[in-house]
Each structure stands twice: as C-alpha cells, then as structure tokens.
Amino acid sequence: MSHAARRASELALDETTVTALRAALKTTADEVVQAIIDEVPSYANALSGRMGGTIRRAVRTALGHYLDLASGNATGGDGDDAAYELGRGEVRDGRSMDALLSAYRVGARVAWRCLAAGAVPAGLPAAEVAKFAELTFAYIDELSAASAAGHADELAARGRAHERHLEHLARELLAGASPDVLLASGQRAGWQPPVSLTAVLLPAAQARPVYRALDPSTLVLDDLPDATGVLLVPDADRSHLLRQLTDRAAVVGPARPWTRASASYARAVRARALSSDVRDTEDHLPELVLSADADAFADLRARALAPLRTLPVATARRLEETLREWLLHQGRRDEVAAALFVHPQTVRYRMTQLRELFPDLASPHRVLELTLAVGLRGS
C-alpha cells in the first residue's frame, strides 16, 4: 500500500459521510471529465463517446477506492497499477506528459470540489475536512506520479524499439537487401526514404557525436568490426558534409540512390583500405579503379613491366618512376625532371634506357598498358 493510501485509511470516515460521497461519484466523474475537456486542449475530442465513458468509469473506480480507504473498508487492490497503465495508454494515444499532468491537476481540483460539497453537509468536522483535503490531493498526486511513470516507461520502450528498427534498417542497407525488404523496414522504423544516401566511415567513438550534428534522418551504427562506425546521410550536400567532418578521421563514400547505399559503403571501405589518408572517395577514383581487381592488376604489371625485371631492383625502381612521370606528363622533359627532382639530362638518359627496353614505347596500346601498370604509386 502506498504512503497516501495508508494515511487515507487513518481518516476512518463515518458511514453517513461515505454514503453521501458515494452517491455523488457519478456526478463527480462527469464533472471531472467535462472540466478536462474544457481546459486541456489535447483532450478536447478524446473523451467523447466510448472513450469518455471509459474514463468516467475509471474516475469513479479510483475515487471509490479512495473512499474505501478513507472509511477503513479497503479490500485490497492498488490504484497505482491502473494509473500506471493509463500513462502508458496515453503514449499510445499520442498525448504528451504535459497534457496528462494537466488533466490530473484539473481533475484533482474538480474532484475535491465535489467531494467537499458532499462531506461538509454530511457533518464532517472542519479539522477532518482539512485533513480529508490534504489526503485527497496526496492520493491523486500518487496516481499522477504512477501515470507519469507509465508514460515515461512507454516512451522509453518505444524509443528503444524505434532505435532498434532504425539500426535494423541500416544493417539491411549495408547488406544490400532488396528494395522491397528495405521499404518494409523503412516503414516499420517510421523512416522516410530520401533520394540518396552517402556512407561515412569513421571511428566508432566519433559516430554518435557526429550523428547529432547531421540531418535527424541520418542512420547510424557504431558497432561494426574494427571499432568502426558508419553514418548513412540522406541527400547530403557533399561540400557541407566534408566541412562538418573536418578534423574527423572520416572516409566519405559517393552519394547513391538510397536502396543502393551498400555501394557507397563498399567504396568507402575499399578507399580506407587503400590509405589512411583518404577522406573523400571522389578524389581517389583512379586508384579505386586500378585496385578493383588486385589479381588482374598484378598480372598486368607483371606483363607490362617484364623488361624491367632483368635489371637490379634499385635501377628498375628508378626507371619505373621515370616512366610513370614521362607518361603522366606526356613526355615533357622539364616537367618530368621537376617531378623527379633530377636534371633534364638525367631524364634524357633514363628515357634512352627505357626505349631500349620497350622498343614499342610509342605504340598507343603499349602506352595504355604501361599507364595503367604504373598508375598506382608504390605498386
């Protein structure tokens, strides 16, 4: 039994007073409900019809239980449980905690006015009336607190469920689930699909702090392998997003239609594997293309650069670097020399060696093959 209920049982109202108060319970419940309708906007249209009847019965039951306590005739049961469930139900009906507490305040005032109107004519002494008032408000306060707890618990449970649905959707997006599956998951999570999603990889510890600064519809996971987090940012302004990620160890994938977010994620993962310095995958497309099939790239290099294998390792490395700069600078000797930090004559000498090793160096096919083969620095 609650503290207020124990104190109420100490009142020991006489049978005459209790009978008078019970006779007014229906009228009291009607007036309480009407006052709530009139004074609390959230309930203006909620307490009519069958719902209104349910609430009136609940008010009569709660006050009747209180009168049982006050007369010393309580037979068990606890109004707190019903009040707790009422609070949970208010969340399901879409009403706020403020609306619920306002309804209790209005209800307490009107209920006491009606109870006092019955107690005083029944001959309850003034001192007992004062105590009755105090305990009535204390009892209703406890019911209010129980409803508030139910409301808060239901909100928390719904919040956790909502978060689980969003996390499930994010995992399905990363896994490349079918559009039908993704649409169903999005609806279950109450998530409005955008046109595009951009994947952002970053350390798990940074995922939530960054997430809080982004579009509220951003999806976040912070429990991926290797202490990695991922954000799926809807319809991102790329330049703005990159500025927001300044000083973060983030890798930003390309924007992709939202059902293909897995492609953005996969590219970000591959880009991060290339180098820890990668930030914007759009700045590293050549490297990503050349590294897409590692075996094919290794075979291409082995075939295209086979003539260099006859040379000492250091010599082969210098000539490969010279060949790379020569291809990239389209044979402009001074630019090649500047890129290599050598004299132009050194470039001339090395190119003579390369032409001897690659007699068909001017062939378009050979130029294409060699450009691809030396395209990744340090391969």
Regions found by a protein language model. Give the residues of each.
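Alpha-helical/coil-rich non-catalytic "connector" segments in signaling and regulatory proteins
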Residues: 1-167, 218, 322-379
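Short capping/connector residues at structural and topological boundaries
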Residues: 102, 174, 294-295
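Short, contiguous, pocket-lining structural segments
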Residues: 161, 174, 192
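Canonical alpha-helical transmembrane segment with a positive-inside/aromatic-interface signature
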Residues: 164-168, 178, 190
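Regulatory cytosolic signal-relay segments
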Residues: 169-173
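Cytosolic nucleotide-utilizing catalytic cores of signal-transduction proteins
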Residues: 179-199, 206-379
